[in-house]
Amino acid sequence: QVEEGNTRVENVSELEKELEEKNPTHVISLIGRTHGTYEGEYIGTIDYLEKPGKVFENVRDNLFGPMVLSLLSKKHDFHFTYLGTGCIFQFDDEHPFGEEKDGFDESSLPNFFGSSYSIVKGFTDQLMHLVEDSVLNVRIRMPITDEFNKRNFITKITNYEYICSIPNSMTVLPELLPYVLDMMKNK
């Protein structure tokens, strides 16, 4: 049985009460801020978080929220799954462009700090390692599905004026999610 949470994560005491009442075996965090409306214009990418005054939302939704869920899950012995991001890495000497033979792994530290989003998510990723005995940290990149949806990466790029041709990682959600469920079951 799957239940959606009703409490905003910044309301920690109410969230803890809801978790205690529902008493789940697993908690899954799909929390994250990558888009929003700024001055009446919808911005569907992390460019939204680069706008003035968006630090609060970025930290609340991309750091505080997931960490609150992970800490409450640990406290109450619920397995916690965090869908984080791989947008915290860039090519470097150990991972040269065009030579994808040795990728980043679970122990890799973030090395991309080119956006507010990546900085905050990079620190969230590092903090998740402090509770890794009770956390499954899944790093996804540019999620795609076969559905037409404004949050689907394929749908997004059809609206871009320019597209660069650089090899990159993408997450095919219908293929990934069964593996995530298996990993959650096997904790």
Q: Whereabouts are the PLM-identified features?
A:
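Conserved cofactor-binding/catalytic machinery of classical short-chain dehydrogenase/reductase
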Residues: 64-68, 79, 123-124, 172
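A short helix->loop->beta-strand "cap" motif at the edges of active sites that frequently abuts
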Residues: 75-78, 133
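SDR active-site strand-loop-helix element
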Residues: 30-31, 80-86, 138-140
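NAD(P)H-binding glycine-rich loop region in Rossmannoid oxidoreductase-like domains
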Residues: 9-63
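Core catalytic loop region at the nicotinamide-binding pocket of NAD(P)H-dependent oxidoreductases
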Residues: 183-187
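NAD(P)-dependent short-chain dehydrogenase/reductase
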Residues: 114, 126-182
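Catalytic helix-loop patch of NAD(P)-dependent Rossmann-fold dehydrogenases
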Residues: 51-65, 87-138, 145
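A short beta-strand-loop structural module common to alpha/beta enzyme folds
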Residues: 1-9
